[in-house]
């Protein structure tokens, strides 16, 4: 896995997070269930993005040694 790939994934996650955030701010959830679902997707993407960022940092630190 390359750091460039991890950066690309992180950028895509951030794009999706912004899209979901914008949709939620505009009230696009049809009901409470849809809102909860969007919140779950948002949280999952945040977790995935944090894991990718941490992995990239660890790889960068390994390369610097």
Model-derived features: where do they sit?
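Charged interaction scaffolds used for protein-protein
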Residues: 64-65
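Short, charge-rich amphipathic interface segments used for partner binding and complex assembly
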Residues: 29-61
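N-terminal acidic leader/helix
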Residues: 1-27
């Amino acid at each position: 896995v390359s750091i460039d790939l991890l950066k690309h994934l992180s950028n895509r996650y951030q794009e999706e997070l912004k899209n979901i955030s914008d949709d939620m701010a505009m009230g696009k959830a049809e009901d409470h269930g849809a809102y909860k679902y969007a919140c779950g997707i948002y949280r999952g993407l945040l977790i995935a993005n944090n894991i990718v960022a941490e992995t990239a940092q660890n790889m960068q630190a390994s390369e610097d040694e």
